[in-house]
Amino acid sequence: MTLRLSKQIMRVTLGAAAIALLAGCASKGEPAYTPKELRSFNETATLDTQWRQNVGNGLGRARYPIAPAREGNTVFAADAEGLVMALDANNGDREWRVELDTPVSSALTAIAGKVYLGTRNGEVIALDQRDGSVDWRARVSSEVLAAPQANQQLLIVQSVDGQVTALDRATGQERWVYTSSQPALTLRGTGTPMVIDPVTFVGLANGRLVTLDNRSGQPLWDLQIATPSGRSEVERLVDLSGQPLITPDGRLFVTSYNSRVVALEATQGSVIWESSLSSRKTPLMVGDYLFVVTDDSQVVALDAGTGQEIWRNDDLEDRWLTAPAFADGNLVFGDFEGYVHLIDARSGDLAGRARVHKSGISVAPVTEGNTIHVQANNGRLETLEVTP
């Protein structure tokens, strides 16, 4: 089978990747296991810096998952203390800068002239992309780490306590609330909902995937993706902390911690295939390939139709890779030492590497064509261009 890169790239919002920490713990800067040393390789692509900017004081000691967002020719970025900036995607010139009176904790979502974000205080804020002015603020049940997700009418927000709140996109008024039971111990962070016009797909810390009717918030179906096993609470963690990925033909791909990757038929939840890969990252689909970053930072390419493994790269094992992005035929990742890595999507070979900042990269890159925007933990936002 060949990888058809001309097909639409199925990318989902990346700022929702959960940190590999237990709830209530502070973030650390290094992996628990010894990461592989970087090795030399035959470079087939180069990463050239186009511009860089400093976004406040970065992601904070807890490494809040405040991934940037891009719409059109503007990049939006924030720091953990409430600074939000809009930058020209081509040259990094600042378009505006606002200081919110509350600490930011979620990735940003930029859509239809608005920027949406969540805070540590359980607020959701909508900003006007033109000048950063606040359109509305709404209160949800608890801290928000997952990027708010929108369809034409609603903004869906998943809080760290597992509650899902639907807000009116135009006004912030609450439309409905869905609550779920949480295990005693969970990973730090939550899954990010996948929202389409009729329904919302929600991954929960108890290992269940729930499909909610967007008219009412009532469940249409739910499925146990990951089943707790083992004696200790840590062994029994089964969080669905990545974002489900849906394709135009109605397939749904879901990752889970300590469990498996599952392909489902989206309307009823019937299982198409499953693969025994543990992942807390959002997967990426390009052409006929599904790319998964495992919990030990191996990168695996699966046949999206059958689940068969096509290739596996362990060169970056235990380097705390971010969720994948895609640029100019390559997968793009950040790591805990602040490197950006390229892996050839067809072959699985290392293709390029550049270092952004030694503070590390814990949020997924944002890409547009052959352009990569990546925000380091200290707040440095760097734009790189991939060239063969």
Question: Residues of each region from the PLM?
Answer:
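Sec-dependent bacterial lipoprotein signal peptides
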Residues: M1-C25
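Blade-level signature of beta-propeller repeat domains, shared across WD40, Kelch, NHL, RCC1
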Residues: V356-P388
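Structural signature of WD-repeat beta-propellers
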Residues: D79, T119, S159, L204-A205, ...
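Bacterial Sec signal peptide processing site at the extreme N-terminus
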Residues: L21-N42
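Short loop/turn segments that connect beta-strands within beta-propeller blades
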Residues: D88-N91, D128-D131, D168-G172, N214-G217, ...
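Extracytoplasmic beta-rich repeat domains
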Residues: G29, Y33, T44-A69, W96-I111, ...
